[in-house]
């Protein structure tokens, strides 16, 4: 045997008809070339409010690493997702490290 177990390789270069998605609505057909008209992916960046930053900074001053319970509480009070809170703490630690390193190199 050749190790392929009867599987056939099919490259994308071979001519294949484009896949079509049919809507339950009459006369509506979605084609892959329409994909660019509907932007997907990253959301636009929205700056945090002063109230949100104040709460995040207050908690960061207490502890640089956040517990699950504190993350959930901050998420609820600031109207941010738990993921946003986690990433803010990660970014804040990096920012502090940069500032400290910059102070070390200038002195």
Curated annotation (Swiss-Prot):
Localization per Swiss-Prot or TrEMBL: Nucleus
GO cellular component entries: nucleus
Keywords, in A-Z order: Developmental protein, DNA-binding, Homeobox, Nucleus, Transcription, Transcription regulation
Gene3D superfamilies associated with the record: Homeodomain-like
Superkingdom in the source lineage: Eukaryota
One Pfam assignment: Homeodomain
Main localization (coarse): nucleus
Claim: ATP-binding is one of the keywords in the record: no
The keyword Nucleus is annotated on this UniProt entry: yes
GO molecular function: DNA binding; DNA-binding transcription factor activity, RNA polymerase II-specific
Residue ranges flagged as DNA-binding region: 41-100
CDD domains noted in UniProt: homeodomain
PROSITE patterns, sorted: HOMEOBOX_1, HOMEOBOX_2
Cross-referenced PANTHER family: HOMEOBOX PROTEIN HOX-A13 (PTHR45804:SF3), SEGMENTATION PROTEIN FUSHI TARAZU-LIKE PROTEIN (PTHR45804)
Family from the record: Belongs to the Abd-B homeobox family.
Function: Sequence-specific transcription factor which is part of a developmental regulatory system that provides cells with specific positional identities on the anterior-posterior axis.
Full protein name: Homeobox protein Hox-A13
């Amino acid at each position: 045997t050749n190790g392929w177990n009867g599987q056939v390789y099919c490259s994308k270069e071979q001519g294949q008809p484009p896949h079509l998605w049919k809507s339950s609505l009459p006369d509506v057909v979605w084609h892959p070339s329409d994909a660019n008209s509907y932007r997907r992916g990253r959301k636009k960046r929205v700056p945090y409010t002063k109230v949100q930053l104040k709460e995040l900074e207050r908690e960061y001053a207490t502890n640089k690493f956040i517990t699950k319970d504190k993350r959930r509480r901050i998420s609820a009070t600031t109207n941010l997702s738990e993921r946003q809170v986690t990433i803010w703490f990660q970014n804040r630690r990096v920012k502090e490290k940069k500032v400290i390193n910059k102070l070390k190199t200038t002195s």
